[in-house]
Amino acid sequence: MRKWILTWILPSLLHRSCFHIICLVGTLSLDCNDMTPEQMATNVNCSSPERHTRSYDYMEGGDIRVRRLFCRTQWYPRIGKRGKVKGTQEMKNNYNIMEIRTVAVGIVAIKGVVSEYYLAMNKEGKLYAKKEYNEDCNFKELILENHYNTYASAKWTHSGGEMFVALNQKGVPVRGKKTKKEQKTAHFLPMAIT
């Protein structure tokens, strides 16, 4: 008789405990919905203004990141005070600090913070700097599997292929016509300013 009572009571006990767990989880989710985004960000251990650099959220538009772009060829692109684009190996050079502003999904504009010139590419694939923003300043940002980023002109192509921002082993900008996504000259790591 005891065996029959246990098999009869056990399912009802399980259903009650499941019901209590569901009620508890529902209460917790309702509590989270009452939080502001800043409170939720605090609870998940990240701050609202600072997003993870490998997150794709910034590609949705309007986000501004201040970074140094480090090329796999060991150079940082810099935009000088007169607008000359070249590479430098000095990490603490203020002319290599870039403002990367999202202008559309996957499209960014790169601006030298100190020089206030935008990085641009013309139809021949030459990198240059421009004081006023225009379509030449738009680049498609792509995060590769090796954790580096590439920046291809959003406006110009060469024979149907993309033209990338690239620095050779001497820090000289490579013409976009001679670049490919796979080349390490076109791979950049956005580094936070410390």
UniProtKB/Swiss-Prot annotation:
Glycans are attached at N45. GO terms for cellular component: cytoplasm; extracellular space. CDD domains: beta-trefoil_FGF7 (cd23319). Keywords: Glycoprotein, Growth factor, Heparin-binding, Mitogen, Secreted, Signal. It is found in: Secreted. Interacts with FGFBP1. Interacts with FGFR2. Affinity between fibroblast growth factors (FGFs) and their receptors is increased by heparan sulfate glycosaminoglycans that function as coreceptors. Belongs to the heparin-binding growth factors family. Plays an important role in the regulation of embryonic development, cell proliferation and cell differentiation. Required for normal branching morphogenesis. Growth factor active on keratinocytes. Possible major paracrine effector of normal epithelial cell proliferation. This is Fibroblast growth factor 7. The gene is FGF7.
